Design a protein with these regions (language model features):
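Divalent metal-dependent phosphoesterase catalytic cores across multiple superfamilies
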Residues: 1-179
């Protein structure tokens, strides 16, 4: 475990960055090498939830942030705040990464869990990019549940969170019957 940290700056070179620390919790679930949830540390690695809040940002301003993970700072990621008095959210329903498991691919093969997650994550990325291009003044993203098809498959959550666009927006999710 390590203390979660984020730093925020006005320039990509991170000069003058302000650092914020947060909290980290360990969940009672562990992730196996196959990306599924298991019940003990002997069967897999611990799952950590890190939370950091950055304060003092101004509206209509472009910032860059980095997160600290495994002893290193990430690449600088850009985000732009919008008008604080007027909000625009995009609402998505059922991204459900992994839902095409068991369906046939374009090559005629039955899709396994990993292939289905990859396929659905690709389509989710296209959907997200298209929606954001059509709505450039979006403040945050919302989903109405079912981010994944199976809550025990970490790789499905990774597919949901993978699009680059997810790094620059606040996200609010609702738990669906598959989550």
């Amino acid at each position: 475990q390590e203390t979660p940290k984020v730093r925020v700056a006005l320039s990509k070179d991170m000069k003058g960055a302000v650092e914020f620390t947060g909290t980290q919790d360990t969940t009672p679930k562990y992730i196996s090498e196959q990306g599924t949830t298991v019940s003990s540390a002997e069967e897999g690695e611990a799952y950590y939830a890190s939370k950091v809040s950055a304060e003092g940002v101004e509206e209509n301003t472009t910032y860059y942030y980095q997160y600290f993970q495994n002893g290193e700072w990430s690449e600088a990621i850009e985000f732009t705040t919008q008008d604080f008095d007027s909000y625009k959210a995009l609402l998505f329903g059922d991204p459900q990464i992994g839902a095409c498991k068991g369906q046939q691919s374009s090559e005629g093969d039955t899709m396994s869990g990993y292939l289905a997650a990859r396929n659905d994550a690709f389509n989710w990325n296209i959907t997200l990019e298209t929606a954001l291009a059509a709505n450039p003044d979006t403040n945050f993203l919302m989903t109405a549940g079912d981010q994944v098809n199976s809550s025990s498959n970490e790789y499905e959550y990774a597919g949901f969170l993978n699009p680059d666009a997810m790094q620059g927006y606040a996200l609010s999710t609702t738990i669906g019957n598959h989550d």
